[in-house]
């Protein structure tokens, strides 16, 4: 795809539905007593993988309606490239008698599963393997577990869902991306799950109620369009609730640190450009924002440092991917173990790679809009993982 620089970006969009909430709603609907309706679900490669997964466990899915089985049954789950699908399915398989096989695409086979596997083994499940493909044979025999969550909060969220299935005490050690755990808890509350907590220790009681659940808008995908407003003009994104707990709401604070003007409405966010200055940021709690924050840093005056602990374990090695692409655009970049040091300026047009990573594709598309010449973004099809309509929305802002 060729993207040519523009003079400004001004416009208004509706945020797509949240991928994270959509995943959680479908898995809870699988466990529920009674039918559930998922309103406004995100339809993308990852959430389709989750729908296929809950079907393999015995749920009936007809559009937005989920009819749970009397008891989830073991089966085969192919998670495509969805880490959430793989980890939640692995955890829930621990509550089922019989063997479940979980597998995924090549990159997903490389992503960490060890913390979750060790936790399930500690609960008495039989697990063959520490990365995909693996088999899980339940049911678990113990009601208390401590999990190392330093590589992924999804280990914790998966065990919380298992708790809603069988009852469980969960202690999360060194959790990263903590807001995603809060999103899991909020969705559990919507499905009538009862739990107690003290910090990141939880006691979850079994029982999920079928419900009508409306998926909120997605701050993660909206961040790319809002960044375009900060860099090139003014953008408003609707369907973003101020009273939410999504991880990437912290992206707005980061934009303000850079010097952008941010207005948070009850159900919208508006961002307008300002004089952008370098910052030092740790986005370990909202790592999905790292690629687009690196792009903002490439245009900000001065030397920025953007870090997050788990960046090398995503759909791509995002530290390396952004270092390679920004360097091709003439940006001075130094690669750190857990992030990037970026000297801001005016990137030039270049041929860049997406590394088959949806967030790299989106970030580099925004970077290209302000470059000194046209850019070629290779393999943009990866955006279908989280927002198939990304480029349609971007074109609306440029009309």
From Swiss-Prot:
Annotated source species: Thermococcus kodakarensis (strain ATCC BAA-918 / JCM 12380 / KOD1) (Pyrococcus kodakaraensis (strain KOD1))
InterPro entries found in the cross-reference section: Enolpyruvate_Tfrase_dom, Enolpyruvate_Tfrase_sf, EPSP_synthase, EPSP_synthase_CS, RNA3'P_cycl/enolpyr_Trfase_a/b
GO terms assigned for molecular function: 3-phosphoshikimate 1-carboxyvinyltransferase activity
UniProt-listed GO biological process terms: amino acid biosynthetic process; aromatic amino acid family biosynthetic process; chorismate biosynthetic process
Role of this protein: Catalyzes the transfer of the enolpyruvyl moiety of phosphoenolpyruvate (PEP) to the 5-hydroxyl of shikimate-3-phosphate (S3P) to produce enolpyruvyl shikimate-3-phosphate and inorganic phosphate.
Active-site feature positions: 288 (proton acceptor)
EC class of the enzyme, as a word: transferase
Top-level lineage group: Archaea
Protein name: 3-phosphoshikimate 1-carboxyvinyltransferase
Principal location: cytoplasm
Subunit: Monomer.
Catalytic activity of the protein: 3-phosphoshikimate + phosphoenolpyruvate = 5-O-(1-carboxyvinyl)-3-phosphoshikimate + phosphate
Pathway as given in its UniProt record: Metabolic intermediate biosynthesis; chorismate biosynthesis
Annotated compartments: Cytoplasm
GO cellular component annotations of the record: cytoplasm
Binding, phosphoenolpyruvate: 19, 83, 111, 154, 318, 359, 385
Assigned protein family: Belongs to the EPSP synthase family.
CDD domains (alphabetical): EPSP_synthase
Enzyme Commission number: 2.5.1.19
Binding site for 3-phosphoshikimate: 19-20, 24, 152-154, 288, 310, 314
Keywords: Amino-acid biosynthesis, Aromatic amino acid biosynthesis, Cytoplasm, Transferase
Database matches in Pfam families: EPSP_synthase
């Amino acid at each position: 795809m060729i993207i040519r620089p523009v003079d400004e970006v001004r416009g208004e969009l509706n945020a797509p539905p949240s991928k994270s909430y959509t995943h959680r709603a479908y898995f809870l609907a699988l466990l529920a007593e009674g039918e559930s309706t998922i309103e406004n679900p995100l339809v993308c490669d990852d959430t389709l993988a989750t729908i296929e997964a809950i079907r393999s466990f015995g749920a009936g899915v007809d559009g937005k309606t989920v009819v749970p089985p009397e008891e989830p049954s073991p089966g085969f789950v192919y998670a495509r490239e969805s880490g959430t699908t793989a980890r939640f399915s692995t955890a829930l398989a621990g509550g089922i008698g019989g063997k479940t096989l979980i597998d995924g695409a090549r990159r997903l086979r490389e992503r960490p599963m060890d913390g979750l596997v060790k936790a399930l083994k500690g609960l008495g499940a039989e697990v063959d393997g520490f990365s995909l493909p693996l088999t899980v044979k339940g049911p678990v025999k113990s009601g208390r577990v401590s999990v190392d969550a330093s590589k992924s909060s999804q280990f914790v969220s998966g065990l919380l869902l298992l708790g809603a299935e069988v009852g469980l005490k969960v202690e999360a050690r060194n959790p990263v991306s903590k807001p995603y755990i809060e999103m899991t808890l909020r969705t559990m509350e919507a499905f009538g799950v009862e739990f107690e907590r003290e910090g990141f220790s939880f006691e979850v009681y079994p029982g999920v109620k079928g419900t009508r659940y409306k998926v909120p808008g997605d701050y993660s995908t909206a961040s790319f369009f809002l960044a375009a407003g900060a860099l090139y003009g003014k953008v408003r994104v609707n369907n973003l609730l101020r009273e939410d707990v999504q991880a990437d709401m912290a992206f707005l604070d980061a934009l303000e640190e850079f010097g952008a003007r941010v207005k948070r409405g009850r159900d919208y966010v508006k961002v307008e450009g300002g004089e952008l200055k370098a910052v030092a940021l740790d986005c370990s709690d909202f790592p999905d924002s790292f690629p687009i924050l690196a792009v903002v840093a490439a245009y900000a005056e001065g030397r920025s440092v953007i870090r997050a602990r788990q960046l090398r374990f995503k759909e791509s090695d995002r530290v390396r991917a952004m270092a390679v692409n920004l360097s091709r655009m003439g940006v001075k970049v130094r690669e750190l173990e857990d992030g990037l040091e970026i000297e801001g300026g005016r990137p030039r047009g270049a041929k860049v790679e997406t590394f088959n990573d949806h967030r790299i594709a989106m970030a580099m598309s925004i970077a290209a809009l302000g470059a000194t010449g046209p850019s070629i973004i290779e393999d943009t099809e990866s955006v279908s993982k989280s927002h198939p309509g990304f480029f349609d929305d971007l074109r609306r802002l440029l009309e």
